[in-house]
């Protein structure tokens, strides 16, 4: 299972604008910094050769080690047998809730990616 998390800022992204010469263009928008955080996992079944996608959105807050542990428990309920988790070296993967889950769940094995290798993780794309 490949696991990763990301965040999206919902602010306008203006590429081009137009205004008469001498007038600075003003683009009105609400200065609210709404955001959505997401955590997802891509699974590959070795026997049936099927892929699975598990995703959870958390609007308005950051993904913490608590959400990572809850997400892992939810995904483990859907999968059978031993599960190998491949993830980056993020600090939220080393929080107390995640460490407690890893010690309680013997069928869960973790393999970290090398230092900076997003191209190795299909969940990043």
Question: What are the functions of these language-model segments?
Answer:
Residues 1, 84-85:
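Hydrophobic "anchor" residues on beta-strands that sit immediately upstream
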Residues 1-73:
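Extended, low-complexity cationic-aromatic segments
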Residues 10, 93-94:
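Short, solvent-exposed loop/turn segments at secondary-structure junctions
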Residues 12-15, 98-99, 123-125:
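Short aromatic-enriched loop/helix-cap "lid" or pocket-rim segments at secondary-structure transitions
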Residues 79-80:
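Glycine-rich phosphate-binding loop signature in dinucleotide/nucleotide-binding domains
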Residues 88-89, 96, 111-125:
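RNase H-like two-metal-ion nuclease catalytic core shared by retroviral integrases
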Residues 95-105:
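Short, aromatic/basic amphipathic alpha-helical patches
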């Amino acid at each position: 299972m490949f696991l990763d998390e990301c965040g999206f800022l919902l602010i306008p992204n203006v590429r081009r604008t137009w205004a008469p010469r001498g007038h600075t263009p003003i683009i009105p928008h609400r200065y609210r910094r709404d955001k959505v955080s997401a955590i997802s996992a891509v699974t590959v079944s070795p026997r049936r050769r099927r892929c699975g996608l598990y995703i959870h959105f958390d609007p308005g807050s950051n993904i913490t080690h608590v959400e990572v542990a809850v997400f892992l428990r939810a995904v483990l309920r859907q999968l059978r047998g031993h599960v190998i988790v491949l993830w980056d070296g993020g600090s939220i993967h080393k929080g107390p809730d995640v460490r407690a889950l890893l010690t309680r769940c013997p069928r869960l094995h973790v393999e970290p990616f090398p230092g900076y290798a997003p191209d190795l993780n299909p969940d990043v794309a």
